[in-house]
């Protein structure tokens, strides 16, 4: 690029420091011991200090200008070689993605991961499953380099792999606007933009030094080519395209992040991840704060991506929809199962059945051989005994088959205090809203004993507010909310339940004080199921993490007597076994249940009636979740599309005679659940005309 061409569009001005050069400063420049005339020497010192300041300023200015220039190719190559030495790359046998090999990790003497081996390649979406505390997030942190394994290898397809990681504790800057927050996803692009501005300012200040100006113009040209290479002009377009897909309106771009709820801030974090176009995508509980519409959008978006993907989620429907294989971590050991979550459940049952049979056969061989040795140990049979001993040695030299670990499913029941009257809740013509938004306008709802209701709707539509109105924590502007007169005893689980725990109490005290007619051992068993080990029972609540407090609040909720359960996102911090425990407890509960949840799998298991919050009204679907899908055309269309996609992924169904025992049990369980849902639907249908 010609010098005159570059100068034409720039506002060039002289600068006062052009031409100045620095001089070395002697180490003995100022000697305090030589001062004889204080006033004269102080003046001298001031002059010297002034000279030092000017020369230092010039030196700093020159350093700043030199820092604007890109490294020479030879230096970049050298850096790349140094970086490459510490990376395990594709030469180790993978062409894309990442592979974990024999990973072991301990914390303070407690082994979390004993033997973890699995890999994810381009086009694969791996679901990591396991109970809370199994080490799933630790594996992601090892992949990103945030943690180092005690032993084993992390093999990456290329040394400078771009890994995007959305952790459970997402970070956003409250002082930025939404657009500025999304811009942080483009780190390289923003660095180029910032450097272009600095180089342009340096050019404007170097008109008296043509050599320097020539170098700066070359750098400016190089940066412009880099900007074109990273498609800098498309940054705004990418953000503008993604924002509405995440649910943001165009006018939201200039709103502060702090003005949005936690759920919307989670969307921003997801958006930044999606904008990075990574080589490997790691997602840790991505659906926790999203409504159903956004979860379905996210599923559709991720399904289209070819990038290797690792997902930690307790959302079984989400895992079903996305995953091509499941990696289970149990007792520190990983096992890989092909297919989605539902296929994993069947495959895991088959594996346990096969492993149990092999272990029993091995034990039978060992026991019979030992018995033979004991019977033939003396006299004329000593030769046969020796042969049997060799057989036993051979059996023991082989790799012994371990008995498969089977976690005991704890069965609990919500304590009930009698039976409520037939009428439980009546919402009559209520109006409610805030200054900038009306949530309900002449809304009506009638709930009777024994109904199990899901409240559905997008984030911000008023689902949680409706629960607060029912509980009397909010008052309607017009209309009234009436609880039934006879023995309606609510037990309320709200999203921020953990925030109201007594921080001075211990874990065990917190649950024991809420419980009635519970044995101490049963309470400890419940706490253990929720991942509170024996050494944590006497720990103060103030010392618990956010997730631990949420699980403790759930345990407290589980032991509180009631006739009405009111649940606001109860599954957010629960692992899959805990969700199954909760589902079973709700199904056996004889009282009334009102639940807000984005977990479709959970909703399908428990409800016999659906209320959808839409445009300030309460739309009533007097049947289970499947009935809601049948009647709601948009929801049904999306569900049919998902079912079709799952059908394509699923293996062909075996003939009944060829099914394993595990598969037969799984299908028997599915039929029983379908039968129970049909009964609930029949019971609910009589209420179809109940509300106006």
Swiss-Prot record:
Residues 86-95 have a biased composition (Polar residues). GO terms for biological process: response to nematode. Residues 98-356, 425-640 form the ABC transporter domain. Transmembrane segments: none annotated. InterPro entries: AAA+_ATPase, ABC_tran_Xtn, ABC_transporter-like_ATP-bd, ABC_transporter-like_CS, ABCF_ATPase, P-loop_NTPase. ATP binds at residues 130-137, 457-464. Gene3D superfamilies: P-loop containing nucleotide triphosphate hydrolases. Residues 680-692 have a biased composition (Basic residues). Residues 64-95, 644-692 are annotated as: Disordered. Pfam families: ABC_tran, ABC_tran_Xtn. It comes from the Eukaryota. SUPFAM superfamilies: P-loop containing nucleoside triphosphate hydrolases (SSF52540). GO terms for molecular function: ATP binding; ATP hydrolysis activity; mRNA binding. Keywords: ATP-binding, Nucleotide-binding, Repeat, Transport. Belongs to the ABC transporter superfamily. ABCF family. EF3 (TC 3.A.1.121) subfamily. This is ABC transporter F family member 5. It comes from Arabidopsis thaliana. The gene is ABCF5.
